[in-house]
């Protein structure tokens, strides 16, 4: 990827394989990678560990005002730290997944983290793949390539259910599907930065694609854009 394409924005609902696709794309392009969802999950861990009332947006904003967050932009690293302690595994736990929509809907926290995301991208001249839920619409609305990765709720639930079983985590497909649908509803109806594709985003539906096919489809979009700007 050349200097012409500094930011590749990748958005979409949970369970689409977005993080893996974005990481693999960044690795293949020699680009940096930023998982903004991990930031909101880290903020959620901070709120949970400090016993903040998740029904009180003012309390969440106050507790996360100076979030001591550190993350790696290496696509091969999953480093996420809070106050010097790794939370890379903790951010994926069920209580965090259940609470992250409430925490990430707080406007003051979103403003703080959007500022952080823009600063990270500007900090280095190396191109960066940034993935989340509002990258193409809010964080980098001028990104030359915006990808909206989607899949049916059923396909996403099936993937997560399979992943849970492989990890030895007790899993019930119907419960996983209900969780996916609930998260979709919360993310798409929140007042600040609701989940939606940017008007000029390329929509990639991965319902019937393997992970490798999805990565190839996004890499092809990048290559075609590169050709068009040369």
Residue ranges of model-derived segments:
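Small-molecule kinase domains that catalyze NTP-dependent phosphoryl transfer to phosphate-bearing small molecules
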Residues: 72, 117-125, 135-138, 142, ...
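Conserved lysine of the Walker
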Residues: 18
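Residue-level signal for inorganic ion chemistry
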Residues: 37, 84, 113, 129, ...
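ATP-dependent NMP and nucleoside kinases share a basic, alpha-helical "lid"
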Residues: 88-167
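Hydrophobic positions on the alpha1 helix immediately C-terminal to the Walker A/P-loop
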Residues: 21
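P-loop (Walker A) phosphate-binding loop of NTP-binding proteins
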Residues: 13
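Hydrophobic anchor at the beta1->P-loop junction of P-loop NTPases
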Residues: 8-10
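N-terminal phosphate/diphosphate-binding loop that engages ATP/GTP or pyrophosphate donors
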Residues: 27-95
């Amino acid at each position: 990827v050349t200097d012409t394409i500094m930011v590749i924005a990748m958005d979409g609902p949970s369970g689409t394989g977005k993080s893996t696709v974005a990481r693999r794309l960044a690795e293949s392009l020699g680009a940096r990678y930023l998982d903004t969802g991990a930031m909101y999950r880290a903020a959620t861990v901070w709120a949970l560990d400090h016993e903040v009332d998740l029904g009180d947006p003012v309390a969440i904003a106050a507790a996360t005002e100076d979030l001591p967050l550190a993350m790696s932009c290496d696509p091969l690293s999953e480093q996420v730290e809070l106050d010097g302690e790794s939370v890379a595994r903790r951010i994926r736990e069920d209580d965090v997944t259940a609470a992250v929509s409430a925490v990430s809907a707080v406007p003051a926290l979103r403003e703080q983290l959007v500022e952080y995301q823009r600063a990270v991208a500007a900090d280095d001249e190396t191109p960066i793949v940034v993935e989340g839920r509002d990258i193409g619409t809010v964080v980098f609305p001028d990104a030359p390539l915006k990808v909206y990765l989607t899949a049916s709720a059923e396909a996403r639930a099936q993937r997560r259910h399979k992943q849970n079983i492989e990890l030895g985590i007790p899993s019930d497909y119907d419960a996983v599907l209900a969780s996916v649908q609930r998260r979709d509803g919360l993310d798409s109806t929140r007042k600040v930065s609701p989940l939606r594709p940017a008007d000029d985003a390329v929509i990639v539906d991965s319902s019937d694609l393997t992970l490798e096919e999805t990565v190839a489809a996004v890499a092809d979009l990048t290559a075609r854009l590169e050709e068009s700007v040369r």
